[in-house]
Amino acid sequence: MSSEHVDVLVVGAGISGISAAHHLQTQCPDKSFLILEGRDSIGGTWDLFKYPVIRSDSDMYTLGFSFRPWRDPKAIADGPSIMSYLRSAVEDDGLHDKIRFGRKVVKALWSSQEAHWELTVLNTRSQQEETLTCGFVHMCTGYYNY
């Protein structure tokens, strides 16, 4: 079982996780962080659901990132447009190397003695468990359980 420590673990690489990572990188540049994503792609809901008429229920001027204004004239965006927006945000911020794909958190324990979180994470590709420790866990897992 491998072990690694970072200051912050972000769980989920959807819209919330990408936003959290952006703010960690820009507002806390001295802090180390990783993003754990259970699937093999960023985007969460917007990557998972690919039926032809998927679209946002909220306008993208509100749903989008404050640090990356939505520029498309369509306020209610389709899924592929939202995915393009998210991919661009990850690319522009250089976040791809911070994302560990195929990682599912199976247990999180707080150690008062060590003053950190210890997470047991399943690598779904190798089926091996990894142990990661951190000072903070930022849960960005979204609404759906997949």
Name what the model sees in each region.
Residues 26-30, 39, 93-95:
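Short, solvent-exposed loop/edge-beta patches enriched in aromatic
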Residues 4, 29, 42, 115-117, ...:
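Core residues of folded domains in eukaryotic genome-function proteins
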Residues 16, 41, 144:
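Conserved Rossmann-like nucleotide-cofactor binding loop
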Residues 24-26, 48-51, 115:
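Short, glycine/charged-enriched secondary-structure capping and boundary segments
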Residues 3-35:
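N-terminal Rossmann-like FAD-binding beta1-loop-alpha1 element of flavoenzymes
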